[in-house]
């Protein structure tokens, strides 16, 4: 079963084992005796595949151990070898039953099977009443019996006992030795390390070691048969094994987080702030963007303004005029929903003893809808008003406020106001325009454009034509078509257009840029939080080095250890993300309750993005601590206090 030839172990310049050669048959009970520092524990660790010899050949169950990789050695420990340690090496957060079941988790056995086997073993060892007890609730003898049960859960063909009675009273020590003798009688191979000759005498074979060399062996040597070596088959990953890995990792991660509540919360704080920032920034951006777009919509979506000249501020635009022929041409286009003229002039408005500067806006019937003007009282202009050049006016909020400061809108309907000495009957009052980005104090009278031309200015040309494009038509294509048609009609391009969608797109692009810049700050907060997670995980690996060594000793693969710490990092980040989302919901609710300017809009995609990004942060910043844990040497890890 075990064959060692010329095994040497060196640590620096010190030779711990010197050309040790021995063989152990299946079913033997062997005691290795020696004083402290003799090399007996180092030899046991090499036999148990926890340590690697500096030179020599080691064959276990026809596998050449010195040529196996770490995971293949872990498989041998998991399937063939059971350890009984002097200090028990039970995991403090797990119950007796859970400690016993742990090697079966890594072996891929289902929950029912490993639970039944653990109960049976503990019952056989007279611990049926201690199934749910934690190690600190057990005596030394009881803890060692739990350790024995753990060594047997996967079969334990080879039991390696390192000073199993060293920390026990005499009664408990005798009980442990009796258990080992019974196990040997049942066919288990036992290798016992001790410094006590009385304990060694309980074995059927005694090997004495001193200064790394075998002094004596009570077994008579026989001719060595030719060794038959075999290659270890590739381990198949079953669904049960994967479920066991995931469940165990989540359970340990959860227990670890609960065991260090304050530290975990402080670690999560960076993630909480980062995720809350991401969600709130997106909500703020969406809310302000929606408000701006709503304002643009009220001012007129899909609208195009046609003005004379080469552009805004063109000093020669006064020499160019739009006319009614242009207006009628545009009205004939089927892809335009509405077309109307717009002109204006400045003057003085008078009511009783109040006189003030004002502007008369000559508009058509459709201008109110196109520009998003909302009526507060009365009515807007109709076709008869425009056709007959009627002296009627719709006052804006500023006009009503300055001319009729203490009266309700409906009470001033029908009254007459003078504008440049022309009387105008008030037929309507507009609501306050809250959608303008900059509030102005201009007093406006909305009158028929025909009235303005015929009775105020005498100018038959138009200052502006406003069109509204149908919803199913691209405003850009419509704008290009209008330019082409008017250019052909007028013989030259002596006008320019302003498309409201261009403004809308500029606002959207600006908001997108602002959101990205603000989101970058949130991402930086996430990265800072991730660095905090990595720091704490490195501390956690350092604190739990002994636990890692125990898990490796009972057969945990490198990927099991790595997954355990990686899932813990991801769990910390995910819990932090969930708390961050909850915090952001409270912030959004409070903001929407207190603010009337615009709402914050919670976006499901930003929440999902926050959760996914937190998991990504957990994987990225948890990888290095997890890798460090997986690369630990089992012997170094077990010796860590």
UniProtKB/Swiss-Prot annotation:
A Pfam family of this chain: MacB_PCD
EC number: 7.6.2.-
GO annotation (BP), single: response to antibiotic
GO molecular function annotation: ATP binding; ATP hydrolysis activity; transmembrane transporter activity
The entry's keywords: Antibiotic resistance, ATP-binding, Cell inner membrane, Cell membrane, Membrane, Nucleotide-binding, Translocase, Transmembrane, Transmembrane helix, Transport
Family statement drawn from the similarity comment of this UniProt entry: Belongs to the ABC transporter superfamily. Macrolide exporter (TC 3.A.1.122) family.
Classification via PANTHER family: MACROLIDE EXPORT ATP-BINDING_PERMEASE PROTEIN MACB, MEMBRANE COMPONENT OF TRANSPORTER-RELATED
Entry protein name: Macrolide export ATP-binding/permease protein MacB
Species the sequence originates in: Campylobacter jejuni subsp. jejuni serotype O:2 (strain ATCC 700819 / NCTC 11168)
